[in-house]
Amino acid sequence: MAGNTEIVYGMHAVRHALQHSPVYVLELWIQNDKQSEQAIRDIMQLAGTTPVQYVSKQAMNKLTHYARHQGVVIRKKKTQSANIDLTSLLTSEDETIPLYLVLDGVQDPHNLGACIRTADAAGVKAVIIPKDRAAGLNATVSNVASGAAENIPVIEVTNLARSLRALQDAGIWIIGTVNDAGTSIYEVDLNRPLALVMGAEGKGLRQNTRDHCDMLVNIPMAGVVESLNVSVATGICLFEAIRQRR
């Protein structure tokens, strides 16, 4: 796809795009043998005058690299949130205490999509990810995020440490999560402008990222496992911040 367009597949993600950003949708692809299904007919009704192509299952599989597309795909312009930069976001006014999510090198697109979906549910102002050595925004991420990737700014940065310093200069407190921290996240006041930093699967936070955090915390673990899936850990930490703010 061209640099300013992307594909989105799966019922939830496609429905969200058609409902919330229909002007960005350029084309709709429907799998031939699914035209009569009610869910597909509902999608087609939402699409209105959007051009529709009916294609084979084989063509759909090729288009989505054999992902679980459920017989429906759209091609759309990237939304404005994809073009927001960190500087403009930090200078914008906040109606509530800002909460950011920073992901340090999450490489699995399914985990990235799940983290973005959780961040959207928690009311996070933006998700910040590195451009290199990490999963980027793609159709798999959009599908797993179920529309959240089109609703919440996801900012890809070239230098994560520099971005953390920019957050600090804007008065944002940086908390990193690591297994060996001496303080539990439940012991910390999260009712302040905050950026929560989560590490990659298995590796955790890089040392340079740890060095740029104001504080390191852990999630208390009672069982034999040493760590949680990053999307699960993200949900625990974000909603602890939300709990404290209510």
Label the model's feature ranges.
Residues 39-40, 134-140, 203-212:
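Short, glycine/polar-rich helix-capping loops at beta-to-alpha or helix-loop-helix junctions
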Residues 53, 126-130, 218:
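Short hydrophobic alpha-helical runs that function as membrane-insertion/retention elements
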Residues 1-91:
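N-terminal positively charged helical leader segments and presequences
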Residues 23, 91-183:
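RNA substrate-binding interface of SAM-dependent RNA methyltransferases
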Residues 175-225, 229-231:
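Active-site/ligand-binding-proximal alpha/beta "capping" segment
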Residues 63-77, 145, 149, 153-157, ...:
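Short basic, glycine-rich beta-strand/loop surfaces that mediate nucleic-acid
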Residues 121, 142-148, 207-246:
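Structured adenosyl-cofactor binding patch, chiefly the S-adenosyl-L-methionine
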